[in-house]
Each structure stands twice: as structure tokens, then as C-alpha cells.
Amino acid sequence: MTTVETPFPATFKPGRAALRLIGSVLVAFGVFLSGFVIDEPAPFDIYMAVLIGFWFILGLKISRTTGLLLAFMLVFMAGGFLSITQMETIGDAPMYLAVTLFLCLSAVFLCAIIDEDHRRLKLIFNAWTAAAVTTAMLGILGYFKAFPGAEMFTRYDRAMGAFQDPNVFGPFLIAPSLYLLHGILTEKISGLPVRAAALGIISLGVLLSFSRAAWAMFAFSAAMMVLLMFIKERSGAFRLKVLIITLG
């Protein structure tokens, strides 16, 4: 007898693979929306709330590692709800707790889907970087009044991109800038021009935000990352590359 080879492994399920791909794309789009918070609730808030709900309904897997994070978040939220009972005037406390709960659920959700497929982490960072470059460009164009109405992307002559506050805009750009810097130092030289251009745009956005906290975060985190990579990597060629790029 002869055996017939199938084009897919026995464990491969095209339907499930398609759903996973669609889910990953939807998550990436949600992360991209995080760079646009002109008004509240922001598109990111509504989109992620719906996405998290659907994903939980369809069966989001919570591993032990993610479950530990969820447990800590629940304890943290319980403390917040208990603190309300000690307040004479509740005021806006319920709204702050609701926002905190949403952020906690978002953190657990992202950890869970990354734990399920680690490749999603790179996808998330790529989407975050795309959002950072886009909103940084808006902030830069607004600062230089590049077109009529561009001032809407500034406040008090400070770039704020598609955010409500320059002090939120600046810190949002830090992680993508580190991601690009790490790629410049570790990835192939062919991708250097694109990464360098994106890093330049984001760096200018951080500068024009005139956020001292963002400046300090950018300088300290970049210096620490380069230093740790320099110490960890034993290759002389890599260390030379780090020195050349850093000094350049």
C-alpha cells in the first residue's frame, strides 16, 4: 500500500489558524489606536473593551503565569474598592477605579495572548512603533505649523501629537524608541536606514514635547539599555558596532 501525503500536518487546522491570524491583526490595530487619544473615551478604549470581551467569550487561555498577574491585579482592585468605603465624598473615584480596572484587564489580556503565541510580542511592538511615528509626525508638524489647523496637535507651544497632554505624548514614545534602537544595534544593517529614520522622528517628537520627564526617561533608558547590551555581548564586532553607532 502507498500512503498519500497531505499538504498540511495532521494537527494543522486551517480554520483555527485563520482565526489566530485575524485575532493577531485585530490586536495590532488596537495597539496602533493607542497613539490617538484626542478625546475620551478614546477609540482605543472602546475598541479594546469590545476586543477583550469577544476574546474572553471565544475562550482566552489564562496560564499560571498570567493567572498570577490576574490575582495581583484583583487584590490591587479590591484595595481600591475598599478605600471608597472610607471616603466622605466619593466624587470621581468610581471613574478612576473603572479606568484602572480597564487597564488591569488590558494588561492581563495582552500577557495572555503573548503567552499563547510569543510572536505576537513583536507584532505589538511594531504596531506601537507605527503609532509612535505617526503621532510624533503630527506633533512635529503641529509644532512647526506646517499646515492650517496644525496647532491642534500642540499645547502651550509644545508638541503633543494626537494626545491631550504633552506630558502623556512624550512618555508614550519612549518604548518604541528603545525598540528601534535595539533593532539598530542587533538586526541586519539593511534595515538600518528605516529604523534610523523612524528613531529620528520619534526622538524629535520627544524633544519638542518639552516634557522633562520624557527627556529623562529617554536618556536614562537608552543609556542603560546600550550599557547592558555592551556588557552582556561578548562579541568584539558587536561592541565595535555599538561604539560606532553610539558615538556617531
Which residues are covered by each model-predicted region?
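Short, flexible active-site loop motifs that bind/organize anionic cofactors or intermediates
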Residues: 111-114, 159, 205
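Non-cytosolic membrane-interface motifs at loop->transmembrane helix junctions
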Residues: 92-99, 155-160
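Residue-level signal for short amphipathic helical patches enriched in basic/charged
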Residues: 101, 116, 210
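Small-residue-rich segments of transmembrane alpha-helices in multi-pass membrane proteins
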Residues: 74-80, 103-107, 130-136
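Transmembrane signal-anchor hairpin modules in multi-pass inner-membrane enzymes, especially those
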Residues: 1-95, 112-129, 183-193, 234-247
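Membrane-embedded alpha-helical segments of multi-pass membrane proteins
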Residues: 40-57, 97-107, 169-177, 216-223
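Alpha-helical transmembrane segments of multi-pass inner-membrane proteins
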Residues: 52, 122-154, 161-232, 236, ...
